Amino acid sequence: MLGFETIGNATITVFDGEPILVTDPWILGNPYFGSWGHKYKIPQQQLENIKNSKYVWLSHGHPDHTDPDSLNLFADKTFLIADHYGDRIYNDLKKKYNVIKIKNNEWFELSEKIRIKNFADWNQDSTIIIEINRNEIILNLNDR
């Protein structure tokens, strides 16, 4: 499959024959001191696609995006982080995970047919453009 699927308000899984990229995959845990939880069950096939993605892109450092219960499921994956001012998110994640800092406004190739470009703002948040097969564009503004 070449394309994408979504679940929740921030998670996109992108495919190029297999799951290549997942964005902001909060799938376990109850962040914000237990005050947040899922009101839906992620279908098993979507959950497998999320977990099998090669790359994990995180838009910002809020607890629902960096929940340890979810992130630990991706310990063997590569995390992609925008070049945020001060590098707090990058520095925190690289203590435990394989992390690549993506330069702003530059294409980053994930596979033969998938590439991304992200933009960080001054407030430790970011937006991602996902290009599929050089003819489809996805703009993920996540929590905005």
Named regions from a protein language model:
Residues 18-57, 68-69, 144:
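Pre-active-site segment of Zn-dependent metallo-hydrolases
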Residues 27-28, 82-144:
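Metallo-beta-lactamase
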Residues 67-76:
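Metal-dependent catalytic neighborhoods of phosphoester/phosphodiester hydrolases
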Residues 19, 75-79:
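A short helix->loop->beta-strand "cap" motif at the edges of active sites that frequently abuts
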Residues 62:
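Catalytic phosphate/metal-binding cores of nucleic-acid and nucleotide-processing enzymes, i.e., regions
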